[in-house]
Amino acid sequence: MNPSSTKVSWATVTLLLLLLLLPPALLSPGAAAQPLPDCCRQKTCSCRLYELLHGAGNHAAGILTLGKRRPGPPGLQGRLQRLLQASGNHAAGILTMGRRAGAEPALRPCSGRRCPSEAASSVAPGGRSGV
């Protein structure tokens, strides 16, 4: 028997050990069951990240932009939840939700007197009013 043919590389041994030990560890009941944190169960804190991670669907875009988004009105949160829980990939809708919610509101007309911004814009460059 040739001694060089019986040598096994450490990489092969490591790979075999991983293949033998990893599947039982992943299939064990302790690894599969992830208990809900107390704050989420009692609703004492915001569990948005936990809900994103454990909900159904593709949440990559929502998780990546979670820290960049400003807290919005409750309607925005509800729309995000509907997008996340629906089937399919809604990355484009999720990524543009913050932009749409942060859009400038339409200007409302002033009641009664003229608006200060209008009065300032109607002054001629020489300092005389164009009114």
Curated annotation (Swiss-Prot):
Region forming the signal peptide: none
Localization: Rough endoplasmic reticulum; Cytoplasmic vesicle; Synapse
Residues with PTM Leucine amide: 66
Name of a matching Pfam family: Orexin
InterPro entries: Orexin
Any one Gene Ontology BP term: neuropeptide signaling pathway
Annotated region (Disordered), positions in chain: 104-131
Residue positions, PTM Pyrrolidone carboxylic acid: 34
Keywords: Amidation, Cytoplasmic vesicle, Disulfide bond, Endoplasmic reticulum, Neuropeptide, Pyrrolidone carboxylic acid, Synapse
Example GO molecular function: type 2 orexin receptor binding
GO cellular component: cytoplasmic vesicle; perinuclear region of cytoplasm; rough endoplasmic reticulum; synapse
Disulfide bonds: 39-45, 40-47
Free-text function comment from the UniProt entry: Neuropeptides that play a significant role in the regulation of food intake and sleep-wakefulness, possibly by coordinating the complex behavioral and physiologic responses of these complementary homeostatic functions. A broader role in the homeostatic regulation of energy metabolism, autonomic function, hormonal balance and the regulation of body fluids, is also suggested.
Family: Belongs to the orexin family.
The protein's name: Hypocretin neuropeptide precursor
The gene coding this protein: HCRT
